[in-house]
């Protein structure tokens, strides 16, 4: 950071692909609104099977929630594969001091650290041409490790309302899962309860994913919506549970404890 000569720090990951207008769009937003932090969209691409398409559809939904969360100031999220902030604000906030004990999540924690002081100066770059692209996880093991990593970093979030929302989503999904499991022992009443709750979840998810997939020109992913809904329910329950009880996972050759 000390060697950076520019006014604005822009970050992405080494395995990401950026678009021709990427930096221009970030610079334009910065010059227009002078925000203290800019979050921008990230998508997966080059999927080869339904498992990878599920990841892409799920991630596109996260981007929709990211934009809405920043706009409403209810739950501010970002991804280090596409964000920007002024060098001056990084120095003012003493960088990652106070959050550098966490193995993952420094992007989100820095955002929330800045938002605590400048709640009205956080922007989301709503432009598909500013999207950066990375690839999905190829195996179930790497997918679980990735999502456990995301889940465990929530313990360091400054904005506790985000944690409460995530817990609420997990509890609702777990309730559906329990209803389906209970129907095997206690009959059709639990099955109907589970189906009713699952239908509510699917309707809410469909409205979000239809809008965001269209916006990012990935309407093709909606062909896997029904299967993805089943995957999503199972993974939310399992990953939420694992993220709550463990700090251990593997990521890019490293074992995190």
Task: Describe the function of each predicted region.
Residues 1-2, 111:
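Short, conserved alpha-helix that lines the donor NDP-sugar binding/gating region
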Residues 30-63, 91, 97-162:
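Catalytic donor/gating beta->alpha subdomain of glycosyltransferases that bind UDP-sugars
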Residues 14-29:
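Acidic donor-binding/catalytic loop of UDP-sugar-dependent glycosyltransferases
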Residues 75-85, 108:
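Short glycine- and hydrophobic/aromatic-rich loop-to-beta-strand nucleating segment
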Residues 6, 14-16, 42, 106:
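Short acidic donor-binding/metal-coordinating loop in glycosyltransferase active sites
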Residues 9:
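Short aromatic/hydrophobic "clamp" motif used to bind/position activated sugar donors
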Residues 162-165, 169-247:
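Membrane-embedded multi-pass helical conduit in multi-pass membrane proteins
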């Amino acid at each position: 950071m000390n060697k950076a000569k520019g006014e604005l720090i822009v970050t992405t990951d080494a395995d990401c692909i950026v678009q021709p207008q990427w930096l221009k769009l970030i610079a334009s937003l910065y010059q227009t609104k002078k925000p203290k932090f800019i979050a921008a969209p990230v998508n997966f691409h080059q999927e080869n099977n339904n498992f990878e398409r599920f990841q892409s559809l799920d991630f596109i939904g996260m981007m929709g929630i990211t934009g809405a969360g920043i706009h409403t100031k209810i739950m501010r999220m970002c991804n280090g594969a596409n964000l920007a902030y002024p060098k001056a604000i990084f120095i003012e906030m003493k960088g990652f001091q106070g959050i550098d004990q966490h193995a993952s999540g420094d992007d989100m924690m820095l955002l929330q650290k800045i938002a605590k002081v400048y709640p009205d100066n956080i922007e989301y770059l709503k432009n598909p041409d500013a999207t950066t692209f990375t690839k999905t996880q190829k195996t179930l093991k790497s997918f679980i490790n990735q999502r456990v990593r995301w889940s465990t970093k929530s313990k360091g979030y400054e904005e506790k309302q985000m944690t409460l929302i995530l817990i609420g989503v997990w509890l609702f999904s777990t309730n559906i899962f329990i209803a389906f499991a209970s129907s095997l022992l206690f009959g059709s009443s639990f099955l109907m309860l589970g189906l009713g709750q699952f239908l509510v979840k699917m309707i809410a998810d469909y409205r979000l994913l239809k809008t965001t997939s269209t916006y990012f020109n990935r309407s093709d992913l909606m062909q896997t919506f029904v299967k993805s809904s089943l995957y999503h329910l199972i993974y939310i329950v399992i990953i939420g549970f694992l993220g709550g009880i463990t700090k251990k996972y593997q990521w890019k050759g490293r074992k995190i404890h």
